[in-house]
């Protein structure tokens, strides 16, 4: 009896509430049937992939972005949102107008489809803005994540 009173007097929540995982997400994917992805985003992702060339010159190390942000079962939309925001940095590479058009199409299209109501509008670090290897990897991860989402909804 004393133990129960002690817990509630000091505002300590029951252990079960502390151990419950946070499952709420502020992102909701709009187009799970894949029409917008297949007809718009995939085409632009493939074009960007061709424009960036081969990744044979890229080192095999994994950037911190991919260690911190994964496309796992509960965070696909959040990953895609962060990756789309990260893509905008590559506009500063100013490769060509066509490159920028495809980049904006993928970035804006992805953010529209994942429909995140994010409270955090942190400025993204610009350390990778001129790294074509990072861009290539980012595009590959975005493509893989979208494919994972679409396969799960079939």
UniProtKB/Swiss-Prot annotation:
Membrane-spanning segments: none
Cellular component, GO, one term: extracellular region
Cellular location(s): Secreted
Cysteine pairings via disulfide bonds: 27-145, 58-133, 71-116
Signal peptide annotation: 1-25
GO biological process: B cell proliferation; bone resorption; cellular response to hypoxia; cytokine-mediated signaling pathway; extrinsic apoptotic signaling pathway; homeostasis of number of cells within a tissue; immune response; interleukin-7-mediated signaling pathway
Keywords of this entry: Cytokine, Disulfide bond, Glycoprotein, Growth factor, Secreted, Signal
Pfam families named in the record: IL7 (PF01415)
Glycosylation site residues: 94, 115
Molecular function GO labels: cytokine activity; growth factor activity; interleukin-7 receptor binding
Chief site of localization: secreted
Domain of life, source organism: Eukaryota
PTMs per UniProt: Three disulfide bonds are present.
The keyword Secreted belongs to this UniProt entry's keyword annotation: yes
Job of this protein: Hematopoietic cytokine that plays an essential role in the development, expansion, and survival of naive and memory T-cells and B-cells thereby regulating the number of mature lymphocytes and maintaining lymphoid homeostasis. Mechanistically, exerts its biological effects through a receptor composed of IL7RA subunit and the cytokine receptor common subunit gamma/CSF2RG.
Family of the protein in this entry: Belongs to the IL-7/IL-9 family.
Assembly, per entry: Interacts with IL7R and CSF2RG.
Name of protein: Interleukin-7
UniProt source species: Rattus norvegicus (Rat)
Gene that produces this protein: Il7
